[in-house]
Amino acid sequence: MVLTPRQKEELNKAIADYLHQCGFEDTLNAFKQDANMPGELDKKYTGLLEKKWTSVIRLQKKVMDLETRLSEAEKEVHHGGGPKKTRSPEDWIPRPPERYTLTGHRSPITKVLFHPVYSVMVTSSEDATVKVWDYETGDFERTLKGHTDAVQDLAFDHTGKFLASSSADMTIKLWDFQGFECIRTLHGHDHNVSSISFLPSGDHLVSASRDKTIKMWEIATGYCVKTFQGHGEWVRRVRPNADGSLIASCSNDQTIRVWVVASRECKCDLRDHDHVIEDLNWAPESATPVINEAAGVEGGKKAMSPGPFLVSASRDKSIKIWDVSAGVCLVTLVGHDNWVRAVMFHPGGKFIVSCSDDKTLRIWDYKNKRCAKTLVAHEHFVTTLDFHKSAPFVATGSVDLTLKVWECR
């Protein structure tokens, strides 16, 4: 491509300005003489060369992203024997490459969570901060500071007005997500608070800790109103079911316990993992028929189970689906090459998504007990993931300090 005389003149002036800004005066004078540029430098060309350079890099990255997407689409068309029908939202799964790679945390990311209403997400980190990001534009919005040690988990109430954070500093903080102020700090655990969740009603929180207990907190007063004891080691995660009548917890003691909130009684004790259980989540109603189908294939069962069902992820590299009412493991998914750090059901119910220390994000067709897609997601351990409940996005966070947003289609 040949530059026009005007473009050449502008390029020369931009180069001259760059040499001047860098203090290369001898080179500048020689260049001005060779390029026949007498007189003072024009201020309108200040910084132009750097701007052009960064624009080229940005465009080059976009071109590479588009080429990767085109290649992915061509592969799908080739393997599918022709253009596929548009997938319905329950079939959407994350596709490479990532839409955004976001940086800002100074230590490993421990949790990523989409806001239930706004187009923002929050992350927590071992750097003791919580950060807010716009997942549609990739813009960083703000940092919430207050904890004095690693922030381990985050939770929104169903309205999205309140955010709760739990930390290795042994506290839980409640944030007004409209004013971004800490409105209450809850004290009571004797060790690292590894997990936090709002009950669906929004008036109570449940937390899990390395002190081996689970606590329930009244939000209006900040008081601990119940303590659940029974795990023999660090309680890693606690999650309430859809109506808030049950809570499930998993632990370093390799068990999952399901508790009746009203009575604090342990309804069942699920054992089949043979290492620390890192994460668990309840199955949505949309998953019930698929789970029954998967269990029928595996166990030859015909009777439909109403559930409820759980999915768990462990350092034994496996993912398990559990029938809480029967107290049994229905399905085991194997394929990760290292600890599985986070797991959840796809909102449509057909898939399970997981992330691992093997640096991958995996999508499981659990009805057929196979991994449907593997994405090499990060350059280090992938510690956390979230699947947006209604928009086609998945977010992942890693020990490599990056947060990635993946589009689903």
UniProtKB/Swiss-Prot annotation:
It holds the Pfam family WD40. It comes from the Eukaryota. Its main location: cytoplasm. It is found in: Cytoplasm, Cytoskeleton; Cytoplasm, Cytoskeleton, Microtubule organizing center, Centrosome. Residues 72-95 are annotated as: Disordered. Keywords: Cell cycle, Cell division, Coiled coil, Cytoplasm, Cytoskeleton, Microtubule, Mitosis, Repeat, Transport, WD repeat. GO terms for cellular component: centrosome; cytoplasmic microtubule; kinetochore; microtubule associated complex; nuclear envelope; transferase complex. InterPro entries: Dynein_regulator_LIS1, G-protein_beta_WD-40_rep, LIS1_N, LisH, PAC1-like_LisH-like_dom, WD40/YVTN_repeat-like_dom_sf, WD40_repeat_CS, WD40_repeat_dom_sf. GO terms for biological process: cell division; establishment of mitotic spindle orientation; microtubule organizing center organization; microtubule sliding; nuclear migration; vesicle transport along microtubule. GO terms for molecular function: dynein complex binding; microtubule plus-end binding. Residues 54-80 form a coiled coil. Residues 7-39 form the LisH domain. SMART domains: LisH, WD40. PROSITE patterns: LISH, WD_REPEATS_1, WD_REPEATS_2, WD_REPEATS_REGION. Dimerization mediated by the LisH domain may be required to activate dynein. Belongs to the WD repeat LIS1/nudF family. HAMAP family: lis1. Positively regulates the activity of the minus-end directed microtubule motor protein dynein. May enhance dynein-mediated microtubule sliding by targeting dynein to the microtubule plus end. Required for several dynein- and microtubule-dependent processes. This is Lissencephaly-1 homolog. It comes from Nematostella vectensis (Starlet sea anemone).
